[in-house]
Amino acid sequence: MRSPLQSCSASEGRAVEAALSVDHAGGRSVLRRQNVGYPLHVTRGFHLDAARPDLLTLYLQSASGGLYAGDRIALDVSVARDAAFHLTTQAATVVHDGRGIGALQRQTITVDSGAFCAITTDPYVLFPGAELALDTVATVADDAVLCVADGFAVHDPRASGRAFSEFSGRLRVLRPDGHLLLHDAGRVSGDELHGALGPFAAAANLIIVAPPDRLPSVKSLQQAADGCGALAGASRAPNDAGLVLRILAPDGGTLSRATDAAFHVAAAAALGVTLSRRRK
């Protein structure tokens, strides 16, 4: 769901809504509809992969400095039948002091039959006092593929000794008939961080929902992340939904590289080709 959205500072935060709709037309995936307002900005679409010219890659950018207390962000992504779409971010998102009210980001994702959708965000950088909740609901057709990656890294720029407040995430994946396929949820507070993560200061999840013949092996996912200096563990998702990869890293940079490497393994299995690196 590392966020594609960032909002400006305000005394009570701000509410921001964005919607992206991707269709398949003329042998390519195209951005058919967008509703994105300040402080968000959508780059032009890129078709970066010669072996998969139908795959549309899009970067969401922001004119602001991160997520602030009281921010309420909503993103709606719809990927139509047979379309292929990768949404990513230009850089990590700073999460500022939540001042007791925190920030909330909601994502609603729809992936139609035969479609591929990947939403991979750079880590959320949690400053002292930061509080962020992520809530994603995805509806995925039986023969479609969804990859969602998000995570966080801790940073205390002034060496104040204060911990972040809380980071929580929830992902629910449903079939078009409403059947709940997967429910993944977690929460960690700054005071609990070392007990939960040990010596690590960054963590991420990569969740892949796909038919069995379009999944990578558990070993290949783990090796891709471990090879970047992270510690990773993968397992089968409930209800034969796909795979879940957990990644721990010493810092945000290592986490980004490990998550990206694992995503490329997942994408190669799902699409049948090796994707080019997304420059940032």
Curated annotation (Swiss-Prot):
Name this protein carries in UniProt: Urease accessory protein UreD 3
Quaternary structure annotation from Swiss-Prot or TrEMBL: UreD, UreF and UreG form a complex that acts as a GTP-hydrolysis-dependent molecular chaperone, activating the urease apoprotein by helping to assemble the nickel containing metallocenter of UreC. The UreE protein probably delivers the nickel.
Function statement: Required for maturation of urease via the functional incorporation of the urease nickel metallocenter.
Family of the protein in this entry: Belongs to the UreD family.
UniProt keyword annotation of Protein transport present: no
One GO CC term, this protein: cytoplasm
Alphabetized UniProt keyword annotations: Chaperone, Cytoplasm, Nickel insertion
Record InterPro entries: UreD
Encoding gene, per UniProt annotation: ureD3
